[in-house]
Amino acid sequence: MELNRSISPQRLGAERFRHRYGLTCAYVAGSMAHGVASERFVEAMTGAGLLASFGSAGLSHARVRAAVARLKGSVPDRRLCINLIHSPQAETVERNLVELLLRESVTAVEASAFIQPTLALVLYRARGARVGSAGPQAAQRIIAKVSRREVARHFMLPPPADMLRRLCEEGALSASEADAAGRLALADDITVEADSGGHTDNQPLLCAFPAIRALRDEIAQSFAAAAEICIGAGGGLGTPAALASAFALGADYVVTGSINQACIEAGTSDGVKALLAQAEPGDFAMAPAADMFEMGVRVQVLRRGTMFPVRAQWLYELYRQRDGLDALSADERERLERQLFRRSIDDVWQETRAYWQEVEPQQLALAEQDPRLRMAMVFRWYLGTSSRWAISGDPQGALDYQIWCGPAMASFNIWSRGVGLGKPEDRSAPAVALALMEGAARHLDALWRAPTVAPPQSEQPAAPPVVVEPDAGFIRDWLIAQIAQQISIASEEIDPSQPFESYGIDSGAAVMILGRLERLLHRRLSPTLIWNYPNIDALAARLSAPVRAVAGQPHGDRQAALPPG
């Protein structure tokens, strides 16, 4: 039983989205490249009823194959999601990944960095599509990350007919699959990505989201399948207020990114997590992207504690000004080899050459004939390796750490210090997610309950409000019901004299129960409250004691004066 509650985290966003992926909350942890969104990270999030996308970008095919094999055994099918990043210089890599995911029956991808459909993406959507009694149905789902209307349009319409035809001619699709896919939108869900870490157009969410949502509604008037597309919001989300703003805009789900890198389960080094936890507003910069270097595409990165943004920009300026490696001055070569590469340019080229020989021999053949392309490949070696130095925590490369990150990290740091999540070692990914969702629900609830017109002032001073404190028995029964619901057993099976640890409640579930308890009692509570008391009986007895008022604060703003335990 809960009192005076109209909004819960489970009600935020679209029920349709939660049902699609079997989620308790409409919350997604977006993919973080190079396995930063690790297997452990995905398992923790999906185990808490949330969605997370494995960060396959930048990993070898063998590494991704191993990750898929592990996740298939530990993650519910509907929640298994792998990042599919567009690889304009390596179409074979993209196609091979799609073939792997289809072969392993991975039913959802988070598609990122796509500007338009590709054969590989269309193949993933169309394979297994059929027309049933309920109409056309896809066997695989696509969650597309976009920031511009013209890109979003591609995902709201059916796959291009010429691509479906070509895949049929290749024997990759049957005629019936192509026909069914031609009646579906390319994507099930579209994330409007605002000012995010990594690839970003630095779009403000307040402008980008309504524009893309309106496009969905416009297209749905002539193409009914588009009406089923959920529109989510991502980029810049690092506090409960930010999530609440996204839901208030009409987001069907929210996506976080930067903030997850500093969580316990993230697949990056402790040094990177420490830098992220110290980030303040203004500690971010744009730098050239490794995957689209020649096109001038940029990514948002952490500037604090690293020289990467400055050095990467210098490489791009060299690329624009020089015709090839042989055109570099002696001073430029010396600086490259000593400060950035920490090895000779020839050694870098040999390593780069071996990589392209394995993944895309055609690109290597072009580079052998084009000095400028060869120079770009060498420079991209630094851009890619700087991420690996950061992830591994290589102390020799500390000044060159490339850490994809956006301003949400700074706002998250400021908020987290007040809720017991200020240190990386305290940041369990599910606990962070659930604390944000609980906070967003409280934020919206408070806003929507606030009176729009101030009541007239009485000539007589108002009597202090009467506050009814729930008794120990009521709180005890409430806690039993909450824990029973959380671990899916009957309330009668809960022994309130047993330690909390015996119920198998993780930190994420504890945070969620704590948020509900705060609203029930109309007071703020210690973030570690549940672990400070031996059992339900002891906690209920303490919470039923009168609240010690803080001078000058109304009842609802009092901090429960609870000893450490």
In which residue ranges do the predicted regions lie?
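Short glycine/serine/threonine-rich phosphate/pyrophosphate-binding segments
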Residues: 37-40, 239-243
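Residue-level detector of anion-binding/catalytic polar loops
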Residues: 51, 107, 252-253, 524
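Charged, amphipathic alpha-helical linkers/stalks
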Residues: 110, 279-344
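Active-site entrance/lid segments in N-terminal catalytic domains of soluble metabolic enzymes
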Residues: 1-228, 258-260, 394-403, 407-459
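4′-phosphopantetheine-dependent carrier domains
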Residues: 460-565
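Glycine-rich beta-strand-to-loop/alpha-helix junction loops that act as flexible
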Residues: 230-238, 256, 503-505
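Domain-length cofactor-binding catalytic modules of enzymes
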Residues: 317-458
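Catalytic or ion-translocation cores adjacent to nucleophile or general acid/base/metal-coordination motifs
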Residues: 195, 241-300
